[in-house]
From Swiss-Prot:
Residues 640-656 have a biased composition (Low complexity). The keyword NADP does not apply. This is Probable Rho GTPase-activating protein CG5521. GO terms for biological process: regulation of small GTPase mediated signal transduction. Pfam families: RALGAPB_N, Rap_GAP. The modification Phosphotyrosine is found at residue 980. The modification Phosphoserine is found at residues 718, 764, 767, 787, 791, 793, 795, 1551, 1949. The lineage of its organism: Eukaryota, Metazoa, Ecdysozoa, Arthropoda, Hexapoda. InterPro entries: ARM-type_fold, Rap/Ran-GAP_sf, Rap/Ran_GAP_dom, RGPA/RALGAPB_N, Tuberin/Ral-act_asu. Residues 400-414 have a biased composition (Pro residues). Signal peptide: none annotated. The keyword Phosphoprotein applies. GO terms for cellular component: cytoplasm; nucleus. Residues 775-785 have a biased composition (Acidic residues). It comes from Drosophila melanogaster.
Amino acid sequence: MFTKKSHADVKKSTAKLQDSKKDSASRLRHLRMILDNVELEESKCLFETNYSHVYFILYDTFIQAEANLKQKVHKAHREELDGSLWLLEKILCLLPELLARRWQCHSLSRIMAKLLHLGNSPKLRREGVRYFLLWYQTLGENAPGYVHAMYADLIPGLIVPQKGVVGPDTEFSASDFLTHPNMKADGGMASVFHDNAFSHPVQSSEVVALLPPSSSEKSAPPDPRDGLEVLLNSMVHTAACLRWRDNRAQKDHRAFAFLLQRFMDVFLPVFSPNFDVSCSIYNPRLDLPVMRSINKKEEVMASCVVVLINWVSRFTHERLLSHRLDCTLHIEDVDQVRLHGYQQGLIVRDVLYVNRENINFVHEVYRQAFLLNFTSKPQIEAIRTAIAVYRDWMTGETPPPFLLEPNDDPPPPSNAGGTPRSQRLRTPSYVGAIAGSKDQLVVRAGRQNVLQVFVTNAANVFLVNTANLNICFPTRSRSYRSTPLEEQTEICKKVLNVYRTMVMNTEMDTRTWEQLLMVLLQVTSIVLHQNQHTLPSGTNKSATLGGILGSAIFQTLIVTWIRAHTKVPVNVLLWEKFLNVLQSLTHREELIIEWNKTIQTLTRVFSRYTYGINLLDLPLDRVAESRAEKRRRIGSVWQGSGSNSAANGGSAASAAISQNRQRESLAESSSSRSEETSSQVPLPNHPRPHHQHTQSQGGTGHGTRPIPLTPMLSRSYSEGSLASAARSSRIRRRRAATPKPKALQPSQLAENRINPQDLRRAMSLDSLARKGDAEETDSYQEGDNESGAGSRSPSPTASSGIEGGSIKDAQLQIDASLDDANSGSYGSGSNSGSISGRRCIILGGSAEGWHPDSTSIMWKRMLGALGDVNRIPKADLHAQVFMHLLEMTQNLIKIKQNQGISTDNQNTQPMPPLVPPIGIVAPWCYGSLSLDRSFKKGKLWALQLLCSLAIQGAVNMQQLPLFYHALHQLLTGEDRDLIYAILKHLEGPRLLSLLLPGHTLLLLDLVHASAILLTSLEVSRSTPRAEVAALLGSLLCYPSSLLTRSVLQPTPQKFELMECSDLQDHILNIVLRCARREPSAKARCIALSQLGQWLLMRLSQPLPASNSGRANLFQQAVPHHKDVHPKASSVYNPRIKEVLQVLLQALQFKHHTIAIVAVDSLKLCAERGRQLAAIERVPQLIITAICKALEIQSVTKPKDSDKVVLTSLMLCLGEFCMAIPAPIMLTPFNEQGDTLVLQVLRVLLQVASGAPRHERVKLTADDDFDMHIAHDDLQGDGRLPEATYQTSETIQKCITAIKLCAKAVSMHLVTHIGHFPMGIGASRLSSMVEEQDDIGNAAYGGQVETRRDSVELPSVVSAQNMQLFMLNSGLVASFIELPTLKLPGGGITAGLVTADKQVRVLMRDLNGKACWDASILYSEPRNAEEPPKTTPKIQHSQPLDSMATSMVTHTPSPRHTLRHRPAGVLPLAKDMAPDLDQLDDMLAYIGHTSPECVAPTVSQLNAPTASPLSGNQEAQAISVILNQRLLEQEFVTHSTQAPSPALRHASSNSSLQQPDQRSLHSTTASFDSLPTRTEMPFQYCRLLFSHLGLAGWERRSRTHLLQRSEKLMRELRNVDLQKCRETHKMAVIYVAAGQEDKGSILRNTSGSSTYEMFVSALGWEIDLETHNGFLGGLPRQGCGATAPYYATPFLEVVYHVATRMPSDSSEAMLLKTRHLGNDEVHIVWSEHNRDYRRDILPTEFCDVLIVVYPLRNGLFRVTVNRKPEVPWFGPLANESVVSGACLATLIRATAINASRTKRAALPLYQQFYEERNRSLDSVSSRYKESTTFEDFASRIYNPMPLSTLGTLRESNASSSAAPLASALLDHNRASVKGWVQASIDSGPIMGIAPSASAGSTAAMEAATGMSSASPRGPRKLGAPFKSVTKKHSLQHIAVGGGAGAGGDTPPESPTLPQRRFK
């Protein structure tokens, strides 16, 4: 039995304990020793056996200690008291059964009274409370009344009123004493022991304090809070301390339940009079909380309430209990004290949860927490605690029993303690006492009831005004003290966070949702209204709770509202309350901000679920094909498969979906976090004005589920919810008829309509137009249809938001992951049979989440949540609302624009049946325009919105009267800001292209408003000066037939029509003024461009009544030959000259962009040169003004922009000089005889020479022309490129380029003026003849044809009949002597007697290459038999091609005379004869008639002077000459008689003898009387060279030979490849109706008739195979047969027309795509109903996109879209309306200017003449041969000496690899004598062994026969040259011929044909 000590010791001590003789102290000591050595059960047996002894020991020791302490407080005496109290505790714990029967009740009460005396020390009194509670719970209900009274006095300072109601036998009455047997004596009234004189014979001594407090302990007055805390803690500490014999667990619970009940009955009503004992969570009273005030009396006891709250939370807060258990279990060697303490906590909690009353008590305690008033820090912490408890109840893993549903199965017993581990710490009986109770099912209230109670009670934290409390609370930071308002704000944030947790993560039923909504409405209404009215107007927002939390409250309310409607059907009356609350708070900016966020978010959801478009990932934003391909590979968000994918659960698909979700969530909000374990959504600490409701695709528990993101609404699940087109149009008409949009408020509609179908229709989005009629079903109930809808998804975020007390930036997110399985893909489930089961909740179905119907209805409901927005009282908020409405409308427009966009760009998708309701807010806009001036900002936003609707075509016929009326009133009103807003947002000419019915009525209003704007001095970026200029310009060029004369009278009060026939004249005046004085650069440019268009139209259609039929829709501008004069009308608009003057004045602008635009506008008229010439003095005016502008624009230190302006001016000048008829250009215009050509050349010479101007040129602009630009809006966009700094090098480059341009233009004019185009057309200005065409087989009449691109050049290099000269640095000339060409019919020289050879001169310069043929003319045919006359006859030989002209030479007549006139006869021309010497006779006549002229030493003037030679020498010289003459005559005679004539040519030391196989050629009309002569191979070239004056000494410094080599010939070929004109290539693309993808557009092979007419008017068709001009990279075969081509004297344009190119194969499509994609300018003709986009044909180029849209009225809308780096250009600006007469011309000019401007913006770009000049300079610098005059003259006589030729042949014949050029370089310095000297030196040899000329073509090819052909067979000429049969009456010539195959023929060069040499 005894375990700790031996039996002897325990028994001995027991005996001593029972010995009454021993003193009580010894007995107590032995008792303590016994208890220390036995178990508890043994101790209980011991006490029960010896209870009398034990109590005696207690009483005796207590009395002794009391007596000792009264005498003196000593340590020993305190120890005696402690021992006595120890025994008291043991008695109370071990003898509960005895005590329960009131054993020693009176004695114990005396002891307890002494212990509980208020004079005792606090420690002793705390112990006394504990002992009393042990005793009190033992007695229970059996306690007498005075014990209950003692309990009521446990809390000092808390006065408990005695109710006087006591139980039976609770106190002794006087009758009990009197009837007691001991009281009876003699007489029945005498007592044996006591004096019975008194009614109470025993007087109780006065109870005094046992142990007064020490001096160190405070003696402050008692605080009820401390007493209450002691009492509550003691209640816990006394639990489970009594050792009952049986049923201990139940009795422990019952004992504590008794204490708790007594506490609730006695103390609770005292310190918490507002404690509602009737509060019940089982039948909750959900009265909405109201505003309360702070009562100071209540605040006194608030600290006690805080103590109670904290005490209850210790045992109901799951997190704290779990934490205590964990701490207990993790400590090694768990002591019994800790374990007992934990068990006590469990008992307390179990008692609190044991029945409904206690559970209601707990919730009422927490309700009292929410009713605290933030007046102390403990109160604030108590509120935090209450919030945390409820939060943990809702989110904890083990809910308390009252949260369980009554119908659910009971929880397992292990869960009773809160955690499974608590099972180990309990005995089976203990657990069974708790879990086995039948009351467990009774206490279950269900989660919904608790949520409703919490929602209602927690709202009280908002409903107290703490702003006026002057209190500060200490914080952790010493420097900062918080205020009650700040603390209340943090608490409210926590409550809102819990509300949001419920909204997002908690399942709630209809009643809970409605309660939450009502509470939020109540909070919103009271808090925001109360703070608004109780504070002065100037108070800062942060000084009120509503000001701080307004945004968060509104957001929570709105989000809860939307979320509720997708979860449960909500009563429609709540919608009324919601509307009323929001409409009453429209004066708060926070509401407007949150409403905007909600609308924008709902618009995104609306877009996704109704139209299948993600606004954050629009199809149009995915421009690059590679990105789209990458999306398709990864797996697009839009490929979700719905419920089928969810059923399959593929891991790869779910992973892809989750990746896409994360990407999209990050795209919407960078602050969105996603954690699976999150439990709530914190609110933002400081609401950001720009934060958005993020759109998350994931929620807790739905992370891996494939979600249907694009339900394609092929069929409506609500059947009739989406109104049909007819019904929606009726509703739109009804709404448009009233300015105030009542239709936006479904509640108002519900009041006026009875039919439930109409009501449901109004609730749904009536603006959704659906093709066809939707089915109508009658299965809906009216109540269901009245409920709203909406949804928000869980937003998992970190739980630290609530713990930290801050509202973080984690918004309630829009639901994209639906919570149930029946919300699958609509596209796949549309054919399912049970459609009604898939209906959304708002329509009476059961499907939760977003559906097309629910999103549409909720979007529209929230749109109208503010009521009539025009009733918003504050103007700035009114403006803010309309700004947000505009943003929403722009998103709707984006949806519309992105519908039907092909993702693969290979086919065009059909337009979907649903169209976004873009114009849904139009009635509000019309209503806002009628407000007063204070709402001006809102009216501006409304106007912008209306204009956007008009541009998008959303203004229907019913709204047009309202729209026109509003525009008319505002345009003619006085408010300029509104006028400017209309003019800006109508986008100028865009209004005209809309073709709104009756829009011409507003023309006069628009012109009137435009005039007001343009005449004002307001210049800013917001002033639409450019748009107005474009609008007026388009109206200026409008066909008069389309302008109605009836327009609205421009007065604001009237709406009447008037006649205005001179509208365009009025517009012209305004545009002229704009061009003269406009301060904005962009508007000035547009005005000048429009004037140029007007000029073009008036010159193209001189008569106003010109035919406007389709036959004259386009005019093709084909350049005519100079002899062809087209018919021109002689009647022109009289204001043409005035307009021209303005354009010409603008040329002098120092603003370079404006000057270039003026030049471009003027160039438009260059094509109409003949029409301009018909107007008096206009050509002279134009030429003079351009020349003057050149002088003005010329500066000494030009920049790149100056260079661009000057070159544009010079090229424009050249164009006009070529366009104006040559007779006008050559006619003198002043007395000095100056012509326009002379004036032009003078200016160009001045520019080219860089001569400085000695006097300043005065501006020719008149006084009305303003050269100043006040607002340069082209600074950042459209400005010409300029270097940031200038250096001498850059300046010199610009000067060189300007001079070169002037030189090129002047040379061009000299060559081509009056000659363009020639017979061949405009395609070529340069000759196609090359040197190799005349070398080789030219001697055979050109019978063999070779390739032009052949690289066999040695025959040219070594040709004896050709020489290359550099006449100056920019002019290379080739002289070639060749036999006279046989032309059909004799050509131009038919019948004339010419030499048998002719000279061909090829000249290359900046202007191109020219070919001149020169031939000697002997006589006319009629004088063939007579001796030839001495007068030369000029004749032209037929050129090789039509671009070559003939050069004329003449032969000198022989000068040998045999007779003389008499000295006195005057020689006259009429009696001149061949045998008379005119000069000799004249000298004789002068000497005879005027002897004074004869010198004294001279006999006569015609007498020769004395010979300087002696007589012998003179005779010898005469003899030599005569011998030479004789030899020549013999040689001639011998050569004419020889059957095989041969020529002999000898070098200085050797001779080459080769037979001459060339038959001598002579003309058909040769001289028979004269012997046939054989000239030297270069004789005629030498004669021409000499006759041209090139052989003179004075030209020696500029004329040089060129070193002939293969490299030189390739360089010359490279020069020939350089263009002589500016070249452009452009793409022309046709888009048919319904085409919006790359594939279908490129497959078009033809277009409409109007398109074909347009293409034909862009230029003229050329045959690609035979075209000799610019091809723009097009191959001659493979890209179609023809292409449009356009050319002027200075430029060439080729159009890559997509419909001309084949598309029958993938290779052809690839080739077409390459050609089109590489063009920098795209011209698109679109007949599709939507605008063309750049990304349809994706390319890195396409810097400028010009799109033409044909309009219904015969006009054309043109848009010009340029990349940002492209500067501004004209004449067409973006958005223009153009007539067909000038469309092609304007498009062509705009495209050319665009291409030119783009190139000018490129760094290091060079013009065509710069590139050609560089090539010519390369030839001059590399191959110029420096020779002495002797060598130079020798090479003219003999181009290739034999020494050089022999070396060439040896090098060619040898096996060495030395190139030909090295041989030329090595031997060109050989000592070679002239031709004549060589002949004299080798005279004898010449006579003996004549040989053929080594330099002749025959000698070169002696080894081959006449019929030998080139080793390469003849083939068709390749690009870029072709030999074709000319279509005109020229001869067919086959030129060229390869060298023979013999050993003397130079080898082929291995160089490729197209390679360039440097």
